[in-house]
């Protein structure tokens, strides 16, 4: 079990925020709206079992970014109705970063994208070898972990994946 003290988390968050600001990248913290507000993060991402988007918005204020995990059209619509700025939908593929997940199939992903007016980001097992299978779904981006951090050269992997994502989204 990994445990980090609140002060360690706060210090690390401030360091990450500084790097993100330097490169013009929004900094969102997963499942910790209070910490996000405390360190001046740009936003928070919450899961279905975490606080509601409305609660996160109350903590972050009107300008904070609130992302919500969704797996069904119903969850997506509810998140949008409660003020989510974007949805993270998935896992869309089998992934090593989340155990015991059943992937959201392409048709459901497409239905979610059609059902909401906020950006949808596909997450979970997304990488260079399967990215193209998400084309035409309506997503507006992807979130990745292993596609970058499992690579020997993270910077090169990020550049390559970004190029591939941009090409896929252009259609």
What are these regions (language model features)?
Residues 34, 91-92, 103-105, 125, ...:
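Residue-level preference for alpha-helix termini and adjacent loops
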Residues 48-58, 88-100, 131-164:
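Glycine-rich phosphate-binding active-site loops on the catalytic face of alpha/beta enzymes
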Residues 9-28, 48-71, 100-128, 161-170:
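Alpha-helix-loop-beta-strand connector modules within alpha/beta enzyme cores
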Residues 1-2:
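Short, small-residue-biased leader/transition segments that mark boundaries at the very start
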Residues 39-41, 46, 69-114, 153, ...:
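Glycine/Thr-rich beta-alpha phosphate-binding loop at enzyme active sites
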Residues 27-42, 56, 71-83, 115-122, ...:
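Catalytic cores of alpha/beta
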Residues 6-7, 128, 151-152:
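Loop/helix-junction capping segments adjacent to catalytic residues or to phosphate/diphosphate-binding pockets
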Residues 12-15, 36-37, 89-91:
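A generic short-segment signal for beta-strand/edge and adjacent turn/coil regions
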